[in-house]
Amino acid sequence: MIRSMTAYARREIKGEWGSATWEMRSVNQRYLETYFRLPEQFRSLEPVVRERIRTRLTRGKVECMLRFEPDASAQGELILNEKLAKQLVSAANWVKMQSDEGEINPVDILRWPGVMAAQEQDLDAIAAEILAALDGTLDDFIVARETEGQALKALIEQRLEGVSAEVAKVRAHMPEILQWQRERLVAKLEDAQVQLENNRLEQELVMMAQRIDVAEELDRLEAHVKETYNILKKKEAVGRRLDFMMQEFNRESNTLASKSINADVTNSAIELKVLIEQMREQIQNIE
């Protein structure tokens, strides 16, 4: 299915530990480039996140951001560092014995850095939930790419219809153009008072027809239209293939323009260039 390289997705999850939000956005890029902004607690997840993205996307500049907000009320139970507390009590008693002044305040002991600490949250369990949310965010992200891709596909198909119409128009004009050119050549010879034998005249007319004959270019343009339709039906990433097809379209339209000796053909050649350029602009954003 056709996918755009421009997309955005956001997904938030909540648990007893707090909340986490994934945000993903991307723009067109020749290759796949990934950029991450992860909180310090989950910086180690970057290789896993990068690999999961690479297995599902092939092109685009992708920015991936994780916001993590722990719930203060969900902190674990307080843990007493008994060893440190005993050391502080012993030190306080020694000071009292030396000066025979002051009393030990238990609250002061508990306030001492490192004596009391909240039990750390299970970051591994939280990381598992966060990675599951990443998979869901990627699902949403790909759906957004595919939705935009279908819109791009419709625009390209409209331009392909325009190309086919211009090809048919030029093909319909060719007998008339050849006859007009024949009469023009004969008139020039008469004006120049040049008399040619019938065989020689026919040879000149054949050579002239070969120079302005665009049947091959029209055939190839029609073949390119058909092949582009086939590419648009493929399920894998097709951006590079479509870009190559636009190069082929350009080559034939340039040849058609160079052979043009008629205003109608010239106008069609110009219109073809416009249609091809419009398709190329859309294709630059296809994965």
Swiss-Prot record:
What does the record say about the knockout?
A: In strain JSG210, wild-type growth rate and motility, increased biofilm production in vitro, decreased persistence in inoculated tomato cotyledons (cv. Tiny Tim seedlings). Wild-type strain JSG210 has high persistence in tomato plant organs; fresh produce contaminated with Salmonella contributes to food safety risks.
Q: Which GO terms describe its biological process?
A: RNA catabolic process
**Has UniProt tagged this entry with the keyword Kinase?**
no
Q: Does the keyword Hydrolase apply?
A: yes
Which cysteines link up through disulfide bonds? Answer: none
Q: What is its EC number?
A: 3.1.26.-
| Cofactor(s) the protein needs | a divalent metal cation
Family of the protein in this entry: Belongs to the YicC/YloC family.
Q: Which NCBIfam families does this entry report, sorted A to Z?
A: YicC/YloC family endoribonuclease (TIGR00255)
Protein name according to UniProt: Probable endoribonuclease YicC
Protein encoded by which gene: yicC
